[in-house]
């Protein structure tokens, strides 16, 4: 009996060791490497006010889960809305429910709103209190229309008897327009409206940055904002570089259809209008696909770059730096874009 028990123990340990790698590989299977091939060709269409975020694997765009919805590492909660994935006492890597983090109340126009509470200060906006700060989204879903090939001169007008304004296009085609090549891009959504000072009469509005004007080399992108003391709508510009033109060849690695993001192996200096950046940078670039998809910036930041110009002059310009890129099938039908030439001495113009 004792001998039989001694032989059974090693067999049991062997079975446990054999089962353990299976569990590990099962967890890893949830995040395949590489990501290519498992993401939908089209980006997700999320409900108004719901952002698209990268899943827990950093592979695919998914609609951020909202309060009370189920969540998991592959289906993250809307962190920008103050939500987190509550997985219960164990707090493991399984499914959970999106919950609101406890935070401070908000005061707007003499009214007190609890953290997470939603209200409408007017028919045009829906606002939410988020840990002492108020964020608003337009209910009219018009956003701010940037000039484009089909509507180079947009203008917003009021409609009698209706809350929301309406965009119309002025047929002013006598103005000379630039001929930059538009980069492949995903459609941009209008950002939320930041209302942090209840005493101000101006509700700040800012659009997303537009697509870079060039698919390779130095270009620029634009956005519209009224974030200034005069509360006036102005168009801002920033420099951008999706990739160097000498790297305009798709990846030919075996089994690799796309390279989303790649970092420069050596420090480089940016060049703009015969000016060279004072500092060196190791920027990230968007790769290319050989299956017809486009790779464009997904998450970016803006920095101030100082350039040294001829005759000892110096120039500072805002410039986009890429954090991550995404590959998708939402490619433009034409390479013609309507951009006004960029003023080398200014990054802002009134609308």
Swiss-Prot record:
One of its GO terms (biological process) is chondrocyte differentiation. Glycans are attached at residue 274. Keywords: Cell junction, Cytoplasm, Disulfide bond, Gap junction, Glycoprotein, Growth factor, Proto-oncogene, Secreted, Signal. The keyword Glycoprotein applies. Residues 27-101 form the IGFBP N-terminal domain. GO terms for cellular component: cytoplasm; extracellular matrix; extracellular space; gap junction. Residues 104-170 form the VWFC domain. Pfam families: Cys_knot, IGFBP, TSP1_CCN, VWC. Residues 1-24 form the signal peptide. GO terms for molecular function: growth factor activity; heparin binding; integrin binding. Residues 258-332 form the CTCK domain. Residues 201-246 form the TSP type-1 domain. Brain and heart, and at a lower level in muscle and intestine, in the embryo. Lung and less so in brain and spleen, in adult chicken. InterPro entries: CCN (IPR050941), Cys_knot_C (IPR006207), Glyco_hormone_CN (IPR006208), Growth_fac_rcpt_cys_sf (IPR009030), IGFBP-like (IPR000867), IGFBP_CNN (IPR012395), Insulin_GF-bd_Cys-rich_CS (IPR017891), TSP1_CCN (IPR043973). Its main location: secreted. Disulfide bonds join 31-57, 35-59, 39-60, 46-63, 71-85, 77-98, 258-295, 275-309, 286-325, 289-327, 294-331. It is found in: Secreted; Cytoplasm; Cell junction, Gap junction. Transmembrane segments: none annotated. Belongs to the CCN family. Immediate-early protein likely to play a role in cell growth regulation. Its overexpression is associated with tumorigenesis and expression of a N-terminal-truncated version of CCN3 gene in chicken embryonic fibroblasts (CEF) is sufficient to induce the transformation of CEF in vitro. This is CCN family member 3. It comes from Gallus gallus.
């Amino acid at each position: 009996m004792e001998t039989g028990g001694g032989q059974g123990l090693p067999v049991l340990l062997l079975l446990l060791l054999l089962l353990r790698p299976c569990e590990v590989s099962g967890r890893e299977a949830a995040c395949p490497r590489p990501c290519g091939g498992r993401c939908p060709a089209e980006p997700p269409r999320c409900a108004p006010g719901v952002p698209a975020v990268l899943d827990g694997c950093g592979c695919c765009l998914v609609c951020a889960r909202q309060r009370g919805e189920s969540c998991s590492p592959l289906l993250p909660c809307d962190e920008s809305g103050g939500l987190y994935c509550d997985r219960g006492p164990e707090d493991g890597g399984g499914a959970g429910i999106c919950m609101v983090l406890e935070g401070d109340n908000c005061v707007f126009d003499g009214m007190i709103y609890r953290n997470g509470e939603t209200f409408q200060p007017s028919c045009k906006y829906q606002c939410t209190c988020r840990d002492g700060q108020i964020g608003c989204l337009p209910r009219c879903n018009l956003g701010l229309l940037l000039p484009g090939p089909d509507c180079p001169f947009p203008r917003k007008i009021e409609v009698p008897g209706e809350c929301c304004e309406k965009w119309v296009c002025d047929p002013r085609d006598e103005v000379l327009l630039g001929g930059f090549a538009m980069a492949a891009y995903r459609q941009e959504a209008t950002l939320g409206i930041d209302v942090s000072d209840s005493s101000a009469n101006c509700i700040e509005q800012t659009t997303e940055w537009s697509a870079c004007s060039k698919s390779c080399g130095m270009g620029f992108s634009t956005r519209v904002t009224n974030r200034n003391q005069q509360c006036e709508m102005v168009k801002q510009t920033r420099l951008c570089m999706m990739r160097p033109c000498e790297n305009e060849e798709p990846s030919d690695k075996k089994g690799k259809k796309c390279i989303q993001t790649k970092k420069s192996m050596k420090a480089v200096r940016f060049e703009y209008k015969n000016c060279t950046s004072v500092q060196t940078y190791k920027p990230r670039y968007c790769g290319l696909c050989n299956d017809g998809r486009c790779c464009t910036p997904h998450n970016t930041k803006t920095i101030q770059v100082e350039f040294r110009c001829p005759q000892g002059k110096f120039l500072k310009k805002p410039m986009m730096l890429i954090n991550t890129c995404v590959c998708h099938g939402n490619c433009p039908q034409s390479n013609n874009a309507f951009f006004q030439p960029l003023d080398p001495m200014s990054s802002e113009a009134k609308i």
